[in-house]
């Protein structure tokens, strides 16, 4: 969806843009390739490992890029610290990066056997192993039900997790989830049976939903009139927060009445993009 992001978000080719989820720097590089040499991009990410990759990737564009290790929930402090009052656009690309899924010992993937971590910020204290081994069955059921959107089997999965403690690796967790499901669900073709529980734990570890809404509320102070905000979500919980936040704020106007979805060609090249939704709004002013 890079082309769609650029065409909707870039209104000033000499402007200042903020990538709140810099990752490996792909969107930043695309933005700078679409703008003039006076443009600047501020890239923020809580994961220092991916920022190191971004720094190397963008070294030839270093005059136009500032990379900051921070959570996007601190975007107001980041921009004030840089002396930036107004920007021309914000971008958020939510979810787990390919590097995080494939990286060693990050614990995001149920296809590998790794320590059960799932922290986007490896310096934060609470990891997935702590949650799995210390939360009550009811609290586990709640987060699997709410954050994993696992409506039918949250109770049986949480019961199995508690029964099979201690659980310290991704494959130990996968085994516990398997034991809490009927065989028909374990062999379901379209989605791995551990997907929803892993999503729930990742959201809980990183406080993702709380941080999204908190961050969106901070954009307004820094947006020029007619500036744009583009947000890519990957599941309905994220999308609902984004849609409702802007829908209920009269100072924003949707430029995408319905979310933009990936093309079949994009899904073919990047299967993870199949669930992506892009929403873009314009700031109308206070």
Swiss-Prot record:
GO terms for molecular function: rRNA (cytosine-N4-)-methyltransferase activity. Pfam families: Methyltransf_5 (PF01795). Its EC number is 2.1.1.199. Keywords: Cytoplasm, Methyltransferase, rRNA processing, S-adenosyl-L-methionine, Transferase. S-adenosyl-L-methionine binds at residues 25-27, 45, 79, 93, 100. One of its GO terms (cellular component) is cytoplasm. Belongs to the methyltransferase superfamily. RsmH family. The keyword rRNA processing applies. Specifically methylates the N4 position of cytidine in position 1402 (C1402) of 16S rRNA. The lineage of its organism: Bacteria, Thermotogati, Thermotogota, Thermotogae, Petrotogales. The keyword Signal does not apply. It catalyses: cytidine(1402) in 16S rRNA + S-adenosyl-L-methionine = N(4)-methylcytidine(1402) in 16S rRNA + S-adenosyl-L-homocysteine + H(+). This is Ribosomal RNA small subunit methyltransferase H. It comes from Petrotoga mobilis (strain DSM 10674 / SJ95).
